[in-house]
């Protein structure tokens, strides 16, 4: 019998049930479809719905949609499809609530991409792959990407929002500068006699991309660190289109959306692929995934045509906000149903992407490598903040930490060690 003023502790199981019940009410309905026309057989997709964040409860679910466009063979694309999700989830502590889990995703995605690349390269296979990896948790959409496959969003309010980056050297000046600063050479294919043809490529290797998973023979300045964007849709929902470059080299985002308006996802994906192939023919594998995020009470139908008046509002909402401009934007667009940008970062520097300045500073476990999740023994871990003149000493307040192997990879990706050093050491 309790005394007056005594505080009762609510069991964790009860709290989880309450949270799960709320999530079930809040979660939208997801309807998806995909289509492919193959040329080389190097495009692969991953679709997993109702993955469980809390194992066994059947309610705290999220969905995953991945597109892997391989090159120089399919090994990297297949390996990434089979291992990336597990590597991302391994980087997220198991005791987080829903909001913390979502906040942890951006850094976990970075860790998962780097671990997948590191593990695949240890197999000494030279193929590579682009990755566009989408996680939908409730109304929050998190996208991580390397390469030139893309993901776009058409919110129900209207407009087009690009959720991925294009890492082709031809169009990305910032990436060209990074590659050359790290020791790579950027130029077109030289056919002899001073004649150069084709898109800009990275040499050695001749890859057109600055970021990918795999590509052991190109150099470590071609990094697996993804561009990550995270947005929260309004309760009106929206449509995602995830496609390989076989689509985007032929049609624009607006053309992709217009050619499938009024159609369900499966038919939409087929129409988009046919539209792209009809314009340029089958020059490459052409793959498309369409995902509709819908309110539960709405019928299963495609996203309605965008409202023209919504475009200006959405573009303003997605711009980076300074402390001076944020209040003005909030006053001008104080409407409840708008898309909210939660996170965006595209730096290729692993030390910046794992820095504790980002939300949820305690997401990394002490004495565990932040990338590969192996145990780091006292005295062996390297703080992500450590400079070249700092001693390798474990201190809890200096985390997160990297094991020696992941620190070595970080140094190579950031141009602190040439990729040739690794190849020579592996051949000894």
Curated annotation (Swiss-Prot):
Record-linked CDD domains: PP2Cc (cd00143)
Record: residues binding Mn(2+) 1: 69-70
Cofactors demanded by this protein: Mg(2+); Mn(2+)
Keyword Isomerase belongs to the record: no
Reactions catalysed according to its record: O-phospho-L-seryl-[protein] + H2O = L-seryl-[protein] + phosphate; O-phospho-L-threonyl-[protein] + H2O = L-threonyl-[protein] + phosphate
InterPro entries in the cross-refs: PP2C, PPM-type-like_dom_sf, PPM-type_phosphatase-like_dom
Start and end residues of each PPM-type phosphatase domain: 24-293
Key words, A-Z: Hydrolase, Magnesium, Manganese, Metal-binding, Protein phosphatase
GO MF, any single term: protein serine/threonine phosphatase activity
Cofactor binding summary note: Binds 2 magnesium or manganese ions per subunit.
Pfam families, per the entry: PP2C
Binding site for Mn(2+) 2: 69, 245, 284
Region annotation (Disordered) ranges: 301-331
Entry similarity comment: Belongs to the PP2C family.
Name of this protein: Probable protein phosphatase 2C 12
Lineage: Eukaryota, Viridiplantae, Streptophyta, Embryophyta, Tracheophyta
